[in-house]
Amino acid sequence: MSIGCKIVKDFQRPAPELVTRFKDMPVANIDDNMGRIAAVDAAIEPIGYKGQLLGTAFTVRVPQGDNLMFHAAMDLAKPGDVIVIDAGGFTDRAIFGELMATYCKARGIKGIVCDGAIRDRGGLAAMEDFHVYARSATPNGPYKNGPGEINVPVVIGGKLVRPGDIVVGDDDGVLFIDPAIAAELADATEA
C-alpha cells in the first residue's frame, strides 16, 4: 500500500463512559466474545507490562523506518488517546524510544501500539502508567523524511484499526473495538 501525506486533525471519539465499560476486562475475555480472532498478531507484545491499557485509537501510518508523522501525531493526540502506528511491521529501525514516549505521557496519552520497532526497551519498560506494545526493539534510529498519514484506517498485526476505535491491552496482547459494537460487546463480556 502506498503512503500519502494526509493529516486528519480530529475525528469522532467514543463517549468516555463507553470506553470505561472495558476497564479491568481481560483481553482474552473480550476476544472470546469477538469470535476469538480479534487480537493482533502475538508478535506485538507489551514492553514491560504495567496493567491494562485502555483508550481511544489515534492512528498513524509511516513509511518503513520513518517517524516524521509520529512527531506531528504526538502534538495532535488528545489526553486519553493511544497512538497506534502502522510501520508496516518493519523492524530494522525504531519508530520511537523513551524520550518521545515521555513526551506523550506528559501530554496525557495513554500509550503507544507500534507494528514496528521501538528502542530504549529498558526505559520504556520502567515508565509508570504508560503502556507500549511493539513488534520488536532495535538500537537503530529512524529516518525523518515522510510522508505519512494521520487518523486514517491502518493495519496493526493483521487487524484493521480506525481512528476512534477503543484500544484494550493487557499482558496477553492488544485488540481494537469498533465503538458501534462496544456496548453490546461489553454486555456480553460482563455476562
Positions of the model-derived regions?
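Feature captures the catalytic cores and cofactor-binding loops of soluble hydro-lyases/lyases
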Residues: 2-163, 176-191
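C-terminal binding/interaction regions
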Residues: 167
